[in-house]
Every structure is written in structure tokens, then in C-alpha cells.
């Protein structure tokens, strides 16, 4: 197998060239056409002693050699995104900015059949968290904000780089008819080529890109510790934050 990369201006692609051997050329052709159809997308998963990664691409060519003494076919796969992404259980890292402390214990006493006096758990909100990133190159994140009550004007910070992302809830109210209310979810994707911010409310999704400050920074993780914090003008304790990220490598 040959693995390399090639550049087109500032755009880098990775190319796989794989040679497959079998008993007869007919067997090879049929199997290769089944698993590597021309111009179709494929995902390659690679496992080594210390890495389990995947990479996506498309089949550039699938060329059986009918004149060779040893039957085979050469398959070329182009990967426009040249990075290997962590796969399996390590494919997605999740950092919660809150914890749920269990409060219910035996024996217990319920003093009322109508009032909700029993406490089963208590949510502890954290406004700062650390994401330790082990990848070879910077990568974007997906930020999830769940509201358990109203909140206004949310600011998210990378305390190391001083980057900030500001969500204007006054603009949100003008756009959707309400500010941020209980059960709302905001999903922010800072991944290159996929940047977006979406409000999910009562099963409907809204593009709220216009609610971001015009000078908003789109966060990326760099190798090592990345410290994020968030604030709100009001209702900060009504916000539950979660940040998810993948890990990318330049090689295996």
C-alpha cells in the first residue's frame, strides 16, 4: 500500500493506492467493484498498536490489470480532508460543564403527598472547564447549550486565547418571538466548513447566525489544555454547557 499527500495550492489531499490480489481476475473485479465503486464515498478504518482512526474519501479509480501474470486491481482513493480522525470509543470527547449530585437516600421520609419535597438529585453548574486535546492539528468543536430557565446575552470565552463568542438574546427574540427560555437548546459548530449556530425549540430548528456578534471568534482546540468559560447577563445558573470534539492526527 502507498500512502501520501499532494498539494493543490493551499489545499492538501491524501491519496491511498491499494493493490488487491485474488484467485481470478473475475473474483477481483467483482469484489473490488462491490466495495470500491468508482466516484463513491468510502471510509477507511485503520487500527495500529496505539491508534484507532478513520478517514473519509472517494474512489478516484479502480483499474484491474488484465495483462499481469498475477491478477489484481489497483484502487486509488482521494481524501480531500487529509486528517485521520479518532474512531471507536475515543471518537468523540465530551466535556460537561455541570454535574448531577445524587441526593436521595434510604431510609427516607415523605412529609407530603401533594408537595414535591423529595429531592433525587441536584444540578451543579460549572462556568469553567478544561479540555485536554492530544491531536496533531487544531480542530473545531460542537458546543451544546441547554436552558432549564430564561437567560440573556451569553458570552463564551477561551481564556487562554482571549477569543469570545457572544449570543445576543435581544436579536434572538426579534428573530423567533422569544428570548432564551426553558427547554431551548443552542448548538454551535465551529468545525471548518461546517460553521453554524442553531436554536432548537419545541422540535423546530432556527438558524440564528445573525444573533452572534459580528466580531465573534470561532473556537478551535490546540494541543494541550484549552480552558473555556461562559457568562450570561442574567440566568447563568439556568444554562447547562457541553462541548464535544474529535481528535485528528496527521498520520498513523
What residues fall within each predicted segment?
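A short, compositionally biased
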Residues: 36-41, 148-151
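N-terminal assembly/attachment segments of tailed bacteriophage virion structural proteins
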Residues: 16-26
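Short beta-strand and beta-hairpin "edge-sheet" elements
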Residues: 38-89
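Single conserved hydrophobic/aromatic residue that forms the stacking wall/gate
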Residues: 1-15
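Short amphipathic alpha-helices in soluble, non-transmembrane regions
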Residues: 28-35
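Short, solvent-exposed beta-strand/turn "edge" segments of beta-rich domains on protein surfaces
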Residues: 5-6, 64-70, 131-134
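Intrinsically disordered, low-complexity segments enriched in serine, threonine, and glycine
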Residues: 92-252
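Hydrophobic residues positioned within well-ordered beta-strands of beta-sheet architectures
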Residues: 13-16, 55, 73-75, 141, ...
Amino acid at each position: 500500500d502507498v500512502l501520501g499527500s499532494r498539494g493543490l495550492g493551499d489545499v492538501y489531499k491524501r491519496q491511498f493506492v491499494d493493490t488487491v490480489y485474488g484467485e481470478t481476475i473475475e473474483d477481483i473485479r467483482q469484489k473490488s467493484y462491490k466495495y470500491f465503486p468508482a466516484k463513491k464515498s468510502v471510509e477507511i478504518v485503520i487500527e495500529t498498536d496505539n491508534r484507532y482512526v478513520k478517514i473519509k474519501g472517494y474512489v478516484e479509480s479502480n483499474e484491474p490489470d488484465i495483462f499481469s501474470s498475477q491478477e489484481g486491481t489497483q484502487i486509488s482513493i482521494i481524501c480531500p480532508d487529509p486528517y485521520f480522525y479518532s474512531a471507536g470509543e475515543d471518537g468523540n470527547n465530551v466535556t460537561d460543564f455541570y454535574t448531577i449530585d445524587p441526593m436521595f437516600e434510604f431510609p427516607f421520609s415523605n412529609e407530603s403527598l401533594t408537595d414535591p419535597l423529595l429531592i433525587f438529585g441536584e444540578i451543579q453548574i460549572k462556568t469553567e472547564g478544561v479540555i485536554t486535546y492530544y491531536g496533531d492539528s487544531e480542530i473545531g468543536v460542537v458546543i451544546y447549550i441547554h436552558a432549564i430557565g430564561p437567560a440573556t446575552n451569553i458570552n463564551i470565552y477561551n481564556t487562554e486565547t482571549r477569543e469570545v463568542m457572544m449570543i445576543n438574546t435581544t436579536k434572538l427574540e426579534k428573530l423567533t418571538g422569544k428570548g432564551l427560555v426553558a427547554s431551548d437548546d443552542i448548538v454551535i459548530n465551529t468545525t471548518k466548513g461546517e460553521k453554524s449556530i442553531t436554536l432548537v425549540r419545541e422540535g423546530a430548528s432556527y438558524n440564528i447566525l445573525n444573533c452572534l456578534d459580528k466580531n465573534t471568534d470561532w473556537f478551535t482546540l490546540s494541543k494541550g489544555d484549552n480552558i473555556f468559560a461562559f457568562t450570561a447577563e442574567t440566568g447563568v445558573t439556568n444554562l447547562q454547557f457541553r462541548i464535544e470534539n474529535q481528535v485528528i492526527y496527521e498520520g498513523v
